[in-house]
Amino acid sequence: MHVKRRVLLALTTAALAVTSLTAAPAVADPAAVPGRDFGNGPERNEVAATDPVAAKRSAGPLGENKAGVRQGYPRKTQLRVYPEDTTDKSIKLGLTPYHAIAPRLNALQARSDRISVEVVGQTGLGRDLYLVTLTAPETARETRQQDAWRALIENDPVRAARDKGLERGYKAPVWINNNIHGNEWEGTDAALRQIEYLATTNDPAAKRLLATSRVYFNVTANPDGRVAGTRANSAGFDMNRDFVTNTQPENRAMRDMIIDTQPVIMLDEHGYVAGTLIEPTGPPHGQNYDFDLYIKHGYTNGLEMEKAVQGLGYPEAQEVVVPFRDLPPGEWDGWPPIFTAQYAMYHGAVSYTIEIPLRVNNAAYDQLPVEELRRRSAINTDVSEATMKTTLAYLYRHRDELVDNQIEIFRRGAAGEAQRYLPDGFVPGFGPEDRFTTEFPRAYVIPAGSGQRSATAAARLVDLLVDHDVRVRQATRPFTLGGRSYPAGSYLVDMHQPKRGLANAMLEAGKDLSNDAPQMYDIAGWSHRLLWGASVDIVKQGQVRVPSRDVVAASPTGGVDAAPGRDLALRVLDGKDASAVNDLLGRGVELRRLADGTVVVPAAERAAAAEVADRYGVRFTSAPNEQGSPLRRVTVAAAVSADELFALREMGFDVRPVSTATLNAGYDLSRVDVLMVSSGLRYDQLVPAAKAQVDALFARGGVVTRGATGSRFNADAGLLPVTAVPGRGDANGIVDVDNSGASVLAGSTPQSFVYSPQWFVNLGAGVRVEQRYAPGNPLVAGHWLPNDDGSGGPTQASGQAAVVSGEAKGARVLMFGTEPMFRAHPKGLFAQVAAAIYWGATR
C-alpha cells in the first residue's frame, strides 16, 4: 500500500467547533486540515449575515466602456475608469488597487496589438470584470478559423484528431484566474506583470508563444472582495465553492470564460500556504475524470512549477507542498467540482490551484508592520508569477500533447468509453488510494408529465445543465427507455457526450467516502438529481434512439389549469412556488393556506396568478372547497448565514437581518412575523428590552431554527422540549430521510443535505417529527464518520428525528437538524423552509 508522506504546514487554522446541546461527553472534532477553511464554521453559525445592500459601494465609474471591433484580434475596449478609492485594502500591501487596473489596461491597449480586453460582467456592487487576451494579431478570417477548430475539438473530436490544419494552426488556450478570494491579492499583480510583459516584449520566445497560443487572464475574479479585503464577495459567498450552483454573477462569468475559451491548461491563484502549495491534489480524486489524461501532465508541470518557485531563492518558498505527493487522503482532495480548478478539469483543462506562501490577510493584515506586509506581498507576487511563467513555457513545449489530450477527453466522452485502469506507479507516487472511477450510465431522463415531481424544478435543472455546456435533448414524441415509458417533452441527457464527466458529476448520487479518507477538505456530497427537486431517472444501459431536438432553454412550465371562476391552488413544492406566493402577497392579493400547505388564490385574482405563473414557471390548479387560514405578506427577521439570507431572498421573502447586537441596539420586531435563527443570535445574551421584544414575537408569530446556534436558541428561550444531539462536526453529504409523519413538510423530497448534522431526542409532549433520518446508515453520498468515542456517527442518527415542529409560548416552532439552504445549493429543499415560514406565520 502506497502511503504519501505528511507535510506539516505552519498555518493558523480555525479548529472545528460545534456547540453541543446534549449531555453526551465532549469530544474533540478531527483536527483541521492545514490551510483548511471549515465548510460549516463560524461564518455560518456564529456571525449573522448583514444586508449586502448596506455594504460600502464604491463611487460609480466615469463614463461607459467603449468596445471596438470584435471580428478579429486584438479586441480592444476603452475601459471606463473608477474614481480613486483610498480605502482599497490592496494599497497597504503595495499592490494594485482596483481603480488603477482599468487605466493600466487602457495604456497597454494603446501600446500593443497583442492585447485584447473585454468586460465580461459586473460584480454584485457593479465593478467590471476584465478578461484579457494575449495573442498574436488575427484577421477576422483567422479568428473564425480558430473558433471553428475549437468547436471541432468538442463537437467532433474524432475529426479534430485527424485535422492537419488544426494540428498546425490551432492556438492552444491557457486561462489564468486570479483573486477569486478577495483577500488573496497577489495573483492579480502577477497577472498584470505578465500581461505587460507579453504585450510589450521583443523576446522572440514570447512572440512564438503568442503565435501558437491564446493566453487568457481573469485579472481579478472578485473585485469587491479585493477592495474590501474579504475572502467572500459582496454577497458573502466563497466563490470557490459556487461552481456547480452559480448563484453569483462573478461565478457565472468565470463559468462562461472556461466554456468559451476551452483552455487546455489553467491556473487558479490563491494564498496562503507556508512554503507554497501547487496541485495536483491528493485523493480522493473526482471519480468522473479521465484521470490518466490529467495526471500525466498535471504532475509533470506541477513539479516544474515547484522547481521554478524554489529557484527564486526565497527561504520562505523552499518547502513547496504538492498535495498529490505530500499529503494523505482528505487533507487537500480534488473530489468536488465546486472549486475552480476541479470544475475546469471537466471542460478539458489540466488544472491547478496555486497557494502562495506568506500570509498577509486577516490578523496578519491588521497586526504586521506595513514594511513586512509589503515584503511578503512582493515575494508572493514573484511566486505567483513564477507559476504563470512556468506554465506558459510548459504550454509552448507541450502544445501538441495538451491539445491532443483535450481532444481525447472529449472523444472518450462522446464514444461512451470506460475510464482507464491506472496501475500503481502510473506516475511516481500513484497508488491504490488514488484510484477513483465510476460506471457511467447510458442516459438520464428528466420526465415530463405525471412522472415529474416538479416541472418547475425540472426546467431549472435543464437550464443549469445547458448553461454548463452539458448536452440535453427534448423528446418530440413519446418513447420507451430503460423499461419506462415517457411522454413527449421529456428531457434526455445522453451520456455519450464530450463532457459526460461533468454531466455525471452533477446528476449521479455520488459516493460514501467515509472509508476512503479520515476527513475531507470541504463538502463530499452533492447531487442535482437528488437535491434540486426534479424527478430524474437513470438508464443504465441500452440503445438511445429517441426522436428529439437539442435544448437551448427549457420549455415554459407555467400556467393556470383551473376553469374560469374557480379559486386557484398552488402546492409549494419548490422555491419557485414560494417566489410566486410571495410575489402575489407583495401585490396585496389575499391568499389562504390550507392545512396541507396548499396556497389558495381567489378566482378574482386569476390575471395576477397567470402573470406570476409565467414569471416563475409554476402551475395553478383548481382549489379544493376548503376555507384555510389567511396568509399575508410575511416579514422574516433572520439571524442567519449569508448563503441562507441569499436563499430566503431568492424565494422572495421580506427578510430583515438581525443578530444579538442589532436586537440589543433596539431593533424593532413589532412588524416581524417569523424569527429565523441559525447564526449570531443568543437568547441568553439579549438585554431585557430585546428579550421582551422576542418574547412578544413568540406570542404572535413563528420561529424557525437551524443547526447548533438555532438549537441553543430554542433551549435558552424555553421553546420546544427536545434535546439536540450533534453529529460529528465535519460530517456532510446527502442523506436518505423519511417524511411519512410530516405535516408542515408534507411532500418533501426523500433526500436531504447535512453539514454538522443534528438530530433530536427526548421529545416532549406536543412535539411532532416532521422528518427522520432513514434507518440503518442514512448517508447516501458524502463523508460521515463517528467521533473518536463512537458518538456522532450516521448509525447513531439512524431513525432519529431530523426536523421537528410544535408550539410553545404561543409560537409555532420548527427546528432543522439538516441544511436545507446550504450555500444556496439544494434548491429542492428550499420549499421546506418556505413551508416552515408560512406555517409559523399563519394562525
Model region roles, listed by residue range:
Residues M1-P30:
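Secretory targeting and sorting signals
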Residues D29, V33-L134, T139-W185, A199, ...:
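Intrinsic-disorder/low-complexity accessory segments
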Residues G169-N177, A190-A232:
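Short helix-loop-beta-strand segments that form the rim/entrance of peptidase-like active sites
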Residues N183, M239-R241:
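Acidic/His-rich structured neighborhood in mature extracellular/periplasmic domains
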Residues N218-V227, E269-G275, T709-G710:
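Short, solvent-exposed turn/loop segments enriched in Gly/Ser/Thr/Pro and often Arg
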Residues A232-D238:
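Gly-rich Lys/Arg/Thr-decorated short loops/hinges at beta-loop-alpha junctions or inter-strand turns
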Residues N246-R255:
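Caspase-like (clan CD) cysteine peptidase catalytic core
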Residues I258, Q262-Y272:
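Proline-aspartate-enriched helix->loop->beta-strand connector
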